[in-house]
Design a protein with these regions (language model features):
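Conserved SAM-binding loop
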Residues: 1-80, 155
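Conserved class I S-adenosyl-L-methionine
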Residues: 70-101
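Short, glycine-/aromatic-enriched active-site segment of Class I SAM-dependent methyltransferases
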Residues: 86-89, 104-118
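Short alpha-helix
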Residues: 114-138
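Short hydrophobic/aromatic beta-strand or adjacent loop that forms the aromatic wall/cage
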Residues: 122, 146-152
Length: 155
């Protein structure tokens, strides 16, 4: 790495509140404003399930593969009994229409705290769908007590 410039660029749809000295770009991960293979690593941890529709998830995956020479994309598994977004067991298996702020207030650990609205907007992704989104990439299943906890995509 001698003689090479290194840095971290954070891409987020929300405006920055504290960049912590990192490069910050406010943009959609479904339409990244960088040329092909601009980054050594495109990294995403538990974000792809928050971009909305399946179409947006495919765009997100495509953009990661386009701008990153290498990729690392992690997303939680809906099959795991505890939803990391709600910090509660089994609720994410209920119909989405039930997951109102009023309902979550009484049935989740974090419900007693103020929650940002985007935390309710989760579109779960199966391992099979990840394989379609990231062709040619390796998908690893993280397990806890034999149950699939999350999926990680790498190339």
């Amino acid at each position: 790495m001698l003689g090479r410039s290194t840095g971290v660029t954070i891409l987020n749809i929300l405006p920055p509140h504290d960049t912590g000295g990192f490069n910050y770009v406010q943009a959609s991960a479904c339409d990244v404003p960088f040329p092909d293979k601009s980054f050594e690593l495109a990294f995403s941890n538990s974000a792809i399930e928050h971009v909305g529709s399946e179409e947006n998830q495919f765009k997100f995956a495509s953009e990661m593969m386009r701008v990153g020479k290498r990729i690392y994309c992690q997303t939680p598994s809906r099959l795991f009994p505890i939803d990391p977004h709600l910090s509660a067991p089994f609720l994410h298996w209920l119909p989405a229409s039930w997951l109102t702020p009023q309902f979550l207030r009484y049935f989740t650990v974090n419900g007693w705290l103020w929650r940002k609205p985007y935390q309710y907007d989760v579109t779960w992704i199966s391992k099979r769908k990840l394989q379609k989104m990231f062709p040619g990439c390796k998908i690893t299943t993280e397990r806890f007590l034999l149950m699939p906890k999350s999926f990680t995509v790498t190339n």
